[in-house]
């Protein structure tokens, strides 16, 4: 969702380690067809609660992200809940919108246009 180009694996792994070390974080593995297809979680960042998900490329377009986010929203009842998605990640933005998130604002982050969507209820 956020901008982690494949060449920036160390930054992504550092981000994941921080989330897993955060006692406020809620994380889940997304399993389908007997295998792991991705992960989803939420955490605190600068006084806001953020949510993010990652689906393996081989599993895109199968509805796993939408199903996982809908189920996750029943687990994490924090509101408002924010999600950051880069402009070119149309699929993730559609998942968020299907689950009730609305655009809060857009801004350039490190030369990438990023949208922040929010779920308030």
Give each language-model segment a name.
Residues 1-58, 70-71, 75-84, 88, ...:
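GNAT-family acyltransferases
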């Amino acid at each position: 969702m956020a901008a982690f180009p494949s060449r920036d694996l160390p930054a992504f792994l550092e981000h994941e380690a921080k989330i897993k070390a955060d006692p406020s974080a809620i994380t889940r593995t997304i399993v389908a067809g007997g295998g792991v297809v991705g992960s989803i979680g939420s955490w605190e960042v600068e006084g806001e609660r953020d949510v993010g998900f990652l689906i393996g490329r081989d599993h895109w377009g199968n509805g796993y992200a939408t199903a996982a986010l809908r189920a996750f929203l029943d687990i994490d009842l924090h509101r408002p809940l924010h999600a950051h998605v880069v402009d070119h990640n149309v699929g993730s933005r559609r998942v968020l919108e299907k689950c009730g998130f609305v655009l809060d604002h857009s801004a350039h982050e490190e030369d990438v246009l990023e949208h922040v969507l929010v779920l308030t209820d």
